[in-house]
Each structure stands twice: as C-alpha cells, then as structure tokens.
C-alpha cells in the first residue's frame, strides 16, 4: 500500500507559503499519499502498511489546516472526482462517511516540484497509471449495483471505507490496493445530498448566530414591559396620565366617558333593625328616665323652696326674739304610709360601730337588694318624727342659714293594721329636739316652733324621698330584731341635713362637689357636725320599749344630754361632704358573688369572671388609692356586711394580680385611717402575703407615722397579726425591715408588741446586726434595752454584731456593744464552786 503523506502547502487563494521544509529531510515521506476528509493519512505501501499493522500505527490523526470554502479548490486534470470542491471541504458533515478523495497532481500546485526534487519512483508511477486506467474503464462500463456489491478492503481501510464500500478487495499477491471508482449517477446523487446538507448546515449556523441577538431583544422587551407596568400603576394611583410619553411606551386607547353622562339611578337597600334585636342596650330610654327622675326631684325642691319663702314672708319682724338668743325650730310630724323594704341587720354580732346601720343615704342603688329576698307584705306604719329644719333669718343685712339634724323615732306595727294618731296626741316638748349650736355668731335670731299637721301618706312619702335623696348625707340606724310580731319596733335615726340639691345617680366625687357648691350658695356658714356612730345614744332593750309616745320626749332629752356640747358645736366634719352611691353594676356583681359563695355551682365561669372583675376594680379604686377616704370605705363595708358576712370577708381580702389586698395598699400609702376601717371590719387577714412574700405588717417599715392615731392603728395591726413572721424571699421579719429603713416609731411599736429581736434571716443576720450595719444608733440602743437581746449570735460568716459594727466603721455602736458585753460578764451568775459561801466553807 502507498503511504499517506500530509502536504502542508496551502490551497490556492489562502495566505501562507509552501516550503519544502515542511517535509523532514531525515525521514522523508513517500511522494505518493492519499488524505481523507478528516485528516487521516493512509499509507499505500503494502510493506509499510503491514509493518504498521504489526506495530498498531495504522491510522494517525493529523492537524487539519483550514482550507478555502466551496469553489476555491481547482479542478485539475489529475482529479478523477468531478465535485472535489464539495468532497474536499472540511466544513461538510456528510463527507465524513464518503469514499476516498483521490486528488491528482493538479490538486496540489507544488506536487510536481516535490516529485522532481525528491526523485521519481517507477513503482508509484505504475500504480497511478494502473489505477487511472481502471477508473476510466469502470466509468465507461455501466454499473447498476456498484455501491451494494463493493466490499471494503481488509488491508487497513476498514474504518474509512466500511460505511460506503466503494473499493473491491485487491488480491494480496499484487501488493497494491486499488479502489474501484463509483458510478457517476451515484456520485451526483451523493454530491446533491451533501450540497443540501451543507446549505441546511449553513442556515442552522446563521440561526444559531441570531440566538444571542434575539435574547438581547427579549431582555430589552421585558424591561420595557416592566417599565410600562410600573408607569401604568403609578398613573392609576395618581389619577391622571402623564403629559409626556417615551418612545418605547405602550399606547393604550381607552374609551372615554361622554361629557354628559346619563343620570344614574340609585336606591337604598338598607334594612331597619331595632337596637334591642342587635343586643345594644337602650341607652336613650335610660337617659330619658334619669332625666325624668331628676326633673321630678327638681320640682319638689323648688316647691319646698317656694314654701319656705312663703313662710318667711308671713313672719312678722316684731315677733323675732332678741339677737342673743339661739334659733330653734321644732317640728312634730306624724306620717302614715306603706312600709318600705329594709335590710335587716342584727345587733348581736360585730363591733359597736358596725351594728345595724341605716343604708338610706348610701344611694338609690341599694334598692336592687330587694331582688334577692322573697315577696313581702305591704305594711302600713306610722312614724313620729322630730325634725329640725333650716330657716334663714329675715334680717336686712345678712341671711344666715342654720343646719340642723333630723331625729326620727319610728313606731311600726308588723300586723299590717294601720293605726292613726292624732296630732294632739303627740306632746311636743322643747327637750325632744336636738340642740344645734350655730357655727358663727348670729346677730339676730329667734326661737320659733312650727307644728305641722298630719299629711296624706303619698305626700309624706314624696317628702321623705326628697329628703333622703336630696339632702341626706349620713345616717346611723339601729334596728332590734322582734321576738314577737306584735311587739312594736323602735328605730333611732340621725340624719345630717343640707339645704342643697343632689342627684342620687351621680358618683361620690360629683355628689361631693355639688353638695359643697350648694352649701356655699345657700349661706356662708358650713354645715353642722354630724354625730359619729360612737357618739350615738344607746338603745334600750326591746323589753323596755313603751308603746305610747308620751314618754319618748324625756327619753330623747336624756340621751341628747349625753352628747357633749363642744362636740355638737364643733366645726364642719368632712364626713358630711361624703356621698356614697353604689352603681347598679357593683350591686349586681356583689349579689352574684354572694350567690357563688353560698353555692359554687350557681354561676357559670363567665358570669363569675365578670362579677369578680367588677368587684375587684371598684374595690381597688375605692380603698387602694393614696387619697382613699375612710368614711367612704366604712360605708361600703357596712353595705357589704348588710348583704352578707361572707361577701364582706371576700371583698375585704380580695387581691389583685400581684397578691396585694386593700390592706397592703393602705399600709404602703400610709393611709392609716383606711387601715383602721379595714381592721375594724373584723374580717381582714393581716398576715396574708403578696407575691413578693411580704405581709401588711412587714410593709409598715416603709410607712411614715405622722400622728398618734397612726401609732395606735399600727399597734392594733401588730396585735392582730404575727409580728415574727418571716418574708418568703430573704426570711426577714418586720423588725428587721423597720431597723434597716430606720423607722424608730415602728421599731418601738414592734418591741411593744413583743417582737423577737433574736430571729435570724437566711444569712444569719439579726435585727441588731442590721442596725449596726446601717449605723442606726438610736435603734441599736432600743434593741440593747431588750433583756432578751443576744449580742453573741453569729451569722453565716461567723461575724457577731460587734464585728459587723467594726467592719462598717461604726465606732460609737461598737463601744455600746462592748459596754453591754462587759456588763453581762460582770453580772454573770457564778457557779456553786465559785460562790463565796462555798469558798468560805472550804477554808
């Protein structure tokens, strides 16, 4: 076989120079070679081919140089292939499976020069001539199945000729493998297929080149779309289109509404719904009812004012007494009317100030208590009242107003049979009326007695309602439980009367302000002092009650004489200006809690939560503020006791989320009058700890004692509780806390209540060590004055009180402790063997 020779000479029309130096001089390749389209060289020399087969170097891939495109290759006479421009192009993908490309000498322009330079080879020339002749003969002879009948040569061209099968096998004896040329029709068909494939490949290459451009255009269009979307949204929010439009903006032609649009027809689709169906409370009706009640009360007050003015005009000026006399107006009135429902309270339990007190001046909200009891029979009672009213002096210069108290003695019959009493049967006496001293000296005053006849029951009830709702500010009512229904009952009632008008629906603060303003408008003098519950006269036993009214006058006279005159004539009492008005929500919540305390299954969880929250908020707002009024707290306590003893215990000891009760807050605010009222209730838990672990007794260390009453109050608190109780955090006692804060008065009170001075906290410290550490010399002296004080106790660090004082630099306290130690050592008791008697006996 001939050896394949690679010719590096460029094709015509391509840059570069062909040089013989491309062929090595030491190992020159044979001049005869055939190159395949993919750069493989086939050696035609048989011997060389056999040698390569043995060595395994039959096919070698060489670097393919770039050749010109189609049409650039010359068609020389030495080329038997008529379409060399298509078969020899390395850009064709279909030419990889084609047959051999036999290029003659005219294909390479320098082939002749190489042949002449290297030298002629007769063997190669004969092979070429033989191959040319065979090709011409085969082209002249018709061939029908050239492609199918040809088989590839087994001599080394299997890889390049297997797919085509152009060359028949050559006899091995000849030493040459000469391929047989295909037919012209087949070559033309192959050439057309390759040309079409090349065109298709070229189109695909052009389309591939357009892909980046199209991607760029697509990204540009997407960006424009995003900008247009943002611009469109901004125009929708602004409500008007922009004046300028960019070149790439999308123009949308939207139909515009006509200038004169047709009138749109509208209709209402609302539905009328009653508020009570929606669950909304009828506030308007409640306000209307409230206004009606206020108007009625105002009319009654105006009528009374007109009546008083008429009486003043009827009085003659010459009938007045001298200016030095006191003004006293006595009125005896017999009233008959239906019995009102009252809250019964026993006088056998509780302290003196807590027994059976009237709830009339506490507001109209207490009428809701009637719902908890059963139906009662309508009873008719008659009341004999001794009333002192206010009469302005008809002087030309000033008009002074005198405030008096109303003392009513009511005699009721439980049988329901009404009894009428004539006005003449009542013996009015001057001693039966309470004496009221004027607050300021009055220039001219006279004593008059006004006797009012018996009025109808309805009129008397209206008058009493006006008195109770408009002018009643404080009442103390004592009621005895009847042993027999036939036994008459007597109630003694003290009512402070003010001339002003108040609304029963107002709260305590509003009522207080309006009462004060009305008092100022009527006269320059403040109201008289109302007797406290302790100053009220004691009731007689029920067995000593007298059915007739003739003896009531002396009895009242004796009891009124027990009241000291200076107290009656003292200045204005702030208790008169306090008005308690229970809200309906608080009353309903208290009743609900009372039911729950009696029966835990009586309320649902939601109802219990609502009632508990309402009572907690109202009670904390009333009693836990720093400016809480003790009288208002006392009245609420009386109201709660009248409802139920369990309710009183529950409300007084109710705690907030931090575990603080009203007693905790009152002690912390140093509001000791409220503390006194809470302690007087008899149900206050004084040792209850909050979440921080402190009891009200421990919190007294933070309070400041201002008066002697405050000291007495904390003494009462200490006696009711455990003064040696420890806090849950550090184990400190009330004495340790008071010593640490330097409260000398509290320390004295605790020592007076026998507080233990030797109790140690979790660190082993005592109250004496706390005093030495903080440098409280006076408190140290108080602690050392206690005989049971042990100065030798040590803490966890092994330090005594003397060592603590020395470490803190308290030299004076250290000297006091040292002196106490020396005194103890000198007065220490001797043992038997050290006593003088034993020593003398031994001698």
UniProtKB/Swiss-Prot annotation:
GO terms for cellular component: cytoplasm; mitochondrion. SMART domains: ANK (SM00248). Phosphorylated by casein kinase II upon estrogen stimulation. Phosphorylation induces the release by KANK2 of NCOA1 and its translocation to the nucleus where NCOA1 can activate gene transcription. Its main location: cytoplasm. Residues 183-234, 282-313 form a coiled coil. Residues 661-827 are annotated as: Interaction with NCOA1. Widely expressed with highest levels in liver and skeletal muscle. It holds the Pfam family Ank. Involved in transcription regulation by sequestering in the cytoplasm nuclear receptor coactivators such as NCOA1, NCOA2 and NCOA3. Involved in regulation of caspase-independent apoptosis by sequestering the proapoptotic factor AIFM1 in mitochondria. Pro-apoptotic stimuli can induce its proteasomal degradation allowing the translocation of AIFM1 to the nucleus to induce apoptosis. Involved in the negative control of vitamin D receptor signaling pathway. Involved in actin stress fibers formation through its interaction with ARHGDIA and the regulation of the Rho signaling pathway. This is KN motif and ankyrin repeat domain-containing protein 2. The gene is Kank2.
